[in-house]
Amino acid sequence: MDVALEDNHIALLQHRAKNSGNTVLFKLPILRGSEPPQEWNHITVAEFAAEVDRVAIFVMTELKARGIPPRSAVTVLYSGSRYQDLIYAIALARASYIPQMCPHILTHPGVIFALMEKAGSKIILYDPSLEPATTDCPYPKMALNPIETIDSSSTINSDSALPTIEDLSSGHADVCFFYLTSGSTSGSPKVVPLTQKFVSTYYKTQFGIWLDGRRFDTQNAFLSRGSICAVAPIIQYFGCLYTGSCIVQPSKMRFSTEELLTLVNVCGLNRMTTFGTWLAPHIQAAKKDPAALKLLQEMRTVSYGGVPISIADDDWCFQNGIPLMDMYATTECGTLMVSAPGKPARFMQPVPGISYRFDPFTDTTTGADNPASTQLLKLILLADSPQIPQPQLLSEDGNFHTGDLFEKQLDGSYLFRGRGDDWIKSEDSRFIDTKAIEEKINDVCSDLVKGCIVVGHLRPSPALFIEAYHDSISTISEDGLKELVLRRLEDFNARQLKHERITDKRLIFIVDEGNLPRTV
C-alpha cells in the first residue's frame, strides 16, 4: 500500500476491503427484548466498506443539495453508541466532509451552536430524538434516518460518484475529525481537531499499546469502548481495521458477568477494554466464582482507562494473574502512560515514542510547593512529540500541559495522583468542574448560602453540600431550601453537560452553620 495513502483512514479502509475483505471487523448483538443476547451478527471489512460507500453517496447528495461544499465541517449530534453512528461518521469522511462529533449529552442549543461556530461547521446532522436541541438553529439541519431506510438508487445520478481515494489523500496537516473534550471549560467543551497525521499515528503506532506487543494465531477480539463521540472508540476502530482485529459489541456497556461469559464463549472475546467502574463488578464476581476468575485470567489483556479501580482490586488481580493494563490518555493527545510490567496496573510508565517532561507541581493558589513528603509532578507533552495537539490547544511555551499529577516511585514508575485543579470525574470518566458549580451557587444563592462544596468523584452525578445561613433555614424548610437552590441553578444547568448537573434535591445536603470544612 502506498505510504501516502496509508496515512488516510479512508484509503486504509478501501485497501483492507480489497485485500482482506473477509476479515470480520464487527460482531453486533442480536437483541430480543430485555434478555441478554445469545447471537451476534458478523460484519466483514468488505461489508462495512460497502455500507460506508452506500451511505456516503446518500449524505454527499443531500449535503450538495443543501449547498454544503466538500471539505466542510459537518456536526453530527447523536449518542454515538450505535453501529449506524460509526457508519455515518466514516461515510461523511468518505464523501470528503469533516465530522464534528457532538455527543447527545450536550442538550443546550446555544452551546451546540457555539461549538459548531468554533469548528467552522456548515450544517448539523442529528438523531431525530434530539430535535429539541436544534431549536432555532442558525445553521441548516438534517435528521439522520436509520441507514436501512436509505435507498441509494434514488440518489444516484451523474453527480453522485464518490471522490477517488487519491482526491481524499490530503496532506498530513489537514483536519479529518473534530472532537470535544469530556468536560466543560468556561461553560463549554474544547474543540479538538484531529489531523490526518494525528489519526494515522494512532493506528500505526499507538494501537500497538493495546496489543501489548504479543502475537497470537487467532484474531484479537476487543470489547467495544462505547460511543464514537469519544476518542478512544474511534482509535479502537482504526486500530482494529489496521491490525485485522475485530470489535465485539455487548448489549450495553454496563453488562453482567453472565453476558461476559457469553461474549467469550460465543464471540471469542479475548481483550477487554472498558472503564474501571464497569470492570469492577466483574472483578467482584471473579472473587466468588472460579469460572469468572478463569475467564479474566485467560484474557489477552484486561485494559481500562479514564476511571481507576480500587487499590485492593488492583492488587488482587495482580496476585491472581489477571492481565490488567491501566491506560492514561487525553482527548487531545491519545495514550500517554501505560502500566509498567511486573507490577500492579496502577504503576505506569510513559509510552514509547513520546517526548515528555515531569515538572514539580506548585499550588498556584498559594504559590507554595507541595509537601516534599509527597512530590507531585505535572505531566507535560513536549512540542516535538508525534502526538502534540494543534497550536490552539497548547500553552504559551508550545507544549501541552495535561493538568494531571503523578508521583514518581523508586523504581521509576509513576502513580496517577489526580488533577492539579478542581475537577473530578463522573463514573464514566467525564470531567466535572466543581469549582465552576460552587462559584455559580455562591453567586445566585448568596443570600441563602454561606458556603458550599461539590463532591462525587467517580459517581453518576455530583452532590452538593450547603452551609446555609441560620436565617435561611429558620424561615424555610430544608426541602424548600433545596428546591429554591435548584430553581436558581436552572439556567446554569441548562448549559452544562448532563453529567455535570445537580438537578435532584436528594443530592443536596444541608449542614449546620460552621460545619462545612471549607468554611471553618
UniProtKB/Swiss-Prot annotation:
Induction: Expression is highly induced during artificial growth in symbiosis with Populus, which is close to its natural condition. Pathway: Secondary metabolite biosynthesis. InterPro entries: AMP-dep_synth/lig_dom (IPR000873), ANL_N_sf (IPR042099). One of its GO terms (biological process) is fatty acid metabolic process. It comes from the Eukaryota. Keywords: ATP-binding, Ligase, Magnesium, Metal-binding, Nucleotide-binding. It is an enzyme of class 6 (ligase). ATP binds at L180, T181, S182, G183, S184, T185, S186, G187, S188, P189, K190, V191. Its cofactor is Mg(2+). GO terms for molecular function: ATP binding; medium-chain fatty acid-CoA ligase activity; metal ion binding. Its EC number is 6.2.-.-. Belongs to the ATP-dependent AMP-binding enzyme family. The lineage of its organism: Eukaryota, Fungi, Dikarya, Basidiomycota, Agaricomycotina. The gene is iboA. This is AMP-binding domain-containing enzyme iboA. The keyword Secreted does not apply.
